[in-house]
Each structure stands twice: as structure tokens, then as C-alpha cells.
Amino acid sequence: MKMVVMVRTDINMGKGKIAAQVAHAAVSLVLDCMSRSSWRDWLDSWLHEGQPKVVVKVSSLEDLLSRVDKARSQGLPTTVISDAGRTQVEPGTVTCAGIGPGPDDLIDKITGDLKLL
């Protein structure tokens, strides 16, 4: 089990901003899994396995959303994070997206080709 957060590299964000956006994605995914019984077993397994998280780079909004669509079609938990626009990016800018927690093999089919951030 793992969670993967994909961060856009085509927008200018500092390290702190990226860290905050990744945290938003991780929290959002966990809350979604807690409220949906079909994902609860995956969440419980992930929690007991040390909560593995992987952060990867994606080069465009189109690529990010395409991968989110693939994950959704596989029944995986997903979240798309849009920034409030108070600091470094315009309001509503999609900064990152998360997939999981879910089975490694399902997530790897979608994100396995992406480079680590």
C-alpha cells in the first residue's frame, strides 16, 4: 500500500509551498478514505504499514489530470489540490494531486514512470 502525490513542475513554487500542497493532498486523501467504506480497508492497511508516501514530478496540468482520471477509473482514492492564491500562485491554480492509499501495483501502473521530486 502507498500514497503518491504528483507535483506540477511547470509552475513556480518554493519548497515550503510544495511541502504545504503535498500535505494538503495527503490529509485530503486520508479524510476521503475515512468517510468511504470501500476504501477503509486500504486505509487501515496503509496505516499499519507505516503510511508510505511518494512524491513525484509531473510536467503539466494535462498530464496530472489524465493520471487522476486513470486512477479514478481504477476505483482508487484521488484528490486534486487547487491553491487559494494568497502567496505564490494565482487563485485556483492546481498545484498537485494525490492517489491512494491503495495497492502498489494499481498505483504503479499510473505513476510508475514519474521521477521523484
Curated annotation (Swiss-Prot):
Q: Does the keyword Cytoplasm apply?
A: yes
Say which domain of life the source belongs to: Archaea
Q: Which CDD domains match?
A: PTH2
Q: Name one GO biological process term.
A: translation
* Coiled-coil portions: none
What PANTHER family does this protein map onto? PEPTIDYL-TRNA HYDROLASE 2, PEPTIDYL-TRNA HYDROLASE 2, MITOCHONDRIAL
UniProt protein name: Peptidyl-tRNA hydrolase
Organismal lineage = Archaea, Thermoproteota, Thermoprotei, Sulfolobales, Sulfolobaceae
